[in-house]
Amino acid sequence: MDKTTGKKASKKSLTTRVMLWLWGILITGILTVVLIFWLICKGMLGYLPPLDELQNPKNKFATEIISADMQSLGRFYRNENRVSVEYTDISPYMINALIATEDVRFYDHTGVDLKSLMRAIMKLGRAGGGSTLTQQLAKQLWSPRANNIFERALQKPIEWVIATKLERLYSKEEILTMYLNQFDFLYNAVGIKSAAQVYFSTTPANLKMEEAAMLVGMCKNPSLYNPRRRPERALNRRNTVLDQMCKYEYISQEVCDSLQALPIELKYQSVDHKQGLAPYFREYLRLVLTAQEPQRSHYSEWNMLQYEIDKRQWETNPLYGFCQKNHKPDGTPYDLYHDGLRIYTTIDSRMQQYAEESVREHMMDLQKSFFREKRKKSYAPFSKDLSTEEIDAIMTRSMRQTDRYRALKKQGMGEAAIRKVFNTPVEMQLFSYNGQIDTVMTPMDSIKWNKHFLRCGFMSMEAHTGAVKAYVGGPNFAHFQYDMVSTGRRQVGSTIKPYLFTLAMDEGMWPCDSTVNDSVTLIDGNGVAWTPRDEHLANQGEMVTLNWGLEKSSNWITAYLMSLFTPEQLVSLMRSFGIEGQLDPVVSLCLGPCEVSVKEMVDAYTTFPNKGIRVEPLFVTRIEDTNGNILATFTPQTHEIISETTSYKMIYMLRNVMDHGTGVRARFRYGLKAPMGGKTGTSQNHSDGWFVGFTPSLVSGVWVGGEDRSIHFDNMSAGQGANMALPIWALYMQKVYADEELGYDTEEQFDVPEWFDAEAGCK
């Protein structure tokens, strides 16, 4: 063999070895890839969700609160404000923009787009990662954050496997819907429904093309293309999306050019539980739905009555503790914050808006009067009757009720050190009706500042159905979160008198029955004499009717009626009217020293326009799960309290209160012409102003007063219920009647038969 032949053989041998090595590397690579995918498919390498989890992804959806007129009132959620929507509820603009920009061959591939993948590999990722929408969905749902290079290298193969499985389990429309429901658009806008609401104050179905393009632009990198913090980048990215839509013939060049010329016009609404419509109602609903079964050991001895009330609610009210009483198919209780429930309420968003507007309008004016009266008074905002020591005691008690105090106490600080903190100026935001005030003030002074603001509660419900249409628990939920509709109880004053008059009417008396208008002395159970005062001295000694007595809110006529019955009889009747709080069986009960909530008073007064039948407040009509399955429906609970004839007598007298008595202000100042009844109330020292009014269809109640009973006007004309509370009701009714779409007619009459004659018993 010559040297040439040897060299050729050597080269051939080297080539063979190289080829064998290359084939070996290729085969090994292929086998390695096959092995990796086999291990992934078996769940032995990385996490691969099982079939049942792929079929039922564990999404955390917020619970949505929906008004009677199908408006979203808000949501309950933790961490993620996500609400599920259906494919048919998403604008086609959103779908087209998403496909044109993120995955143009979406309808052609089966989870992995090989063409895009190869392009990404050839260009080393500079042309994008090649991920399909299905892969992105897989990453969103099941790809945890990688902790090392090995885990990061496995992420893509795992996503490919999951994506192919998703494509077999779901239709293309379902995958698009899941993707848009899952994506986080920042600012607590998780999912397309939240994003449409937060950025444009609209729904996914009503997104304009340029709005949809902006949101799709955020899908590439929401932080980088944040329209609030980086508007220029967001605009450029939106225009890129529009170019893509034009490129793939979803829109014409002319449309593209016209839309690109438009600026981004955000209608941003921050997601905050303390903001938005009906915040007090939403919080009330949250507490009721998540209530636990009452345990006696959790209540102090002095609070046993509240335990009995809560226990009765648990046993009789299906809404109370709903999440604990009802379980999902897997046996666990419903989670209000993650299970995506839909709660359909009785609240009407328009009437709720009118109620909040009425509260704000009147409370602003009333607050100005209160500030004027208390200006430069050293004891402000308290009554001039309080001593310095009494004021200090109130302020100390209020300090100890703050979150700041509890936090400092938990840190182990002593009382002296805590007081020093409370008397050290710090930056803070204070409430005012003209907007928040940024200032530097001591926490102690801020407590006193907040005490200057009068509080209120308002609730309106339909007399015959019990449907609660409006609920305002205070002047501003962000600053004053204590609910004065359901939680707070205050002395009711003369609004209690209709119960005693009802007792008399039910026992056979008539509005036209007369008695002497004179001082009455009663003896209570302890043998102590009680003689109430009265303002109507000009009529002293005259014969007056019971109708006149209620019309003028006469204490003497009320005391006369009280002399005909026992306190126990009055307590019993009030219990049947739905009053659950402390009721002491004493003769003075007839003038309203007892503490009652606005909700209870409104509930009770439904008895009058409803022919003697009390209708309990109905807050929710049905609850659905995230798939639209009905979990529960709710109907009004009714109780027959008095006879129809008695209710007719009471309507007659309470209408006269509005036409000629203490409620006449609604007629001459606010111009209300519709048939209506009602009663004002003012507690001792005019600490509490009340008004409960009703029309043939609506019953509404108002309370206004200070945070403490020692905070009140110094004169009766300003502090009476007709001045403090009635105007809110009157403003609300004006707005309700002005909105013809609501269907409340000023010509509607009370359902009193023609044969009824209020004077019949005296003829």
PLM regions: where:
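N-terminal type II signal-anchor transmembrane helix
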Residues: 1-66, 105, 366
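Peptidoglycan glycan-strand catalytic modules in the bacterial/periplasmic cell-wall system
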Residues: 2, 6, 16, 29, ...
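Flexible glycine/proline-enriched surface loops and loop-helix/loop-strand junctions
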Residues: 79-81, 158-163, 199, 221-227, ...
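Short, well-structured active-site flanking segments
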Residues: 107-116, 190-193, 252-257, 505-525, ...
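Extracytoplasmic/periplasmic proteins that interact with beta-lactams or build/remodel peptidoglycan
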Residues: 132-136, 148, 211, 246-457, ...
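Active-site-adjacent helix/loop patches that line small-molecule binding or acyl-intermediate pockets
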Residues: 141-143, 148, 152, 347, ...
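Short, glycine/proline-biased beta-turn/loop segments that scaffold the active-site neighborhood
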Residues: 263, 487-543, 616-629
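A penicillin-recognizing enzyme superfamily signal
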Residues: 345, 349-365, 397-462, 467, ...
